[in-house]
Amino acid sequence: MAAAAEGVLATRSDEPARDDAAVETAEEAKEPAEADITELCRDMFSKMATYLTGELTATSEDYKLLENMNKLTSLKYLEMKDIAINISRNLKDLNQKYAGLQPYLDQINVIEEQVAALEQAAYKLDAYSKKLEAKYKKLEKR
């Protein structure tokens, strides 16, 4: 490639020189010195190692965060489980108490029905007594 570049330069120098501003001149491409390449490679590997270390550290931190979140979630679910167990126990107690009160509630319902029937009988008796009173007053006036 260097030989081709030299050939191009030689061809251009044989041409008559122009003062045209659009014409560009080429310079010979030089390979960097061996020490520069070695230093650049070391620098590249050092920066790549720093980059990869950062990426791995970030990934590791993400996994630690997920682990902590999972632990907290697990604790919350354990708390919720305990609460649900307590609620279930309390509901069973309430159901037992309700079952114990059920005969009394049934008696209350029966008494309520009897009171309603007695009230209807009282209204009928009141209406009948008013009719009797009206008849009595009518007979008394005669």
Swiss-Prot record:
Subcellular location: Cytoplasm, Cytoskeleton, Microtubule organizing center, Centrosome; Lysosome membrane
Residue numbers bearing the N-acetylalanine modification: A2
Lineage top rank: taxon: Eukaryota
InterPro entries: BLOC1_su2
Any single biological process term in GO: microtubule nucleation
Biased composition (Basic and acidic residues): 12-33
Major location category of this protein: cytoplasm
Positions in coiled-coil regions: 79-127
Any GO molecular function: gamma-tubulin binding
UniProt GO cellular component terms: axon cytoplasm; BLOC-1 complex; BORC complex; centrosome; cytoplasmic side of lysosomal membrane; cytosol; gamma-tubulin complex; mitochondrion
Its biological purpose: Component of the BLOC-1 complex, a complex that is required for normal biogenesis of lysosome-related organelles (LRO), such as platelet dense granules and melanosomes. In concert with the AP-3 complex, the BLOC-1 complex is required to target membrane protein cargos into vesicles assembled at cell bodies for delivery into neurites and nerve terminals. The BLOC-1 complex, in association with SNARE proteins, is also proposed to be involved in neurite extension. As part of the BORC complex may play a role in lysosomes movement and localization at the cell periphery.
Name of this chain's protein: Biogenesis of lysosome-related organelles complex 1 subunit 2
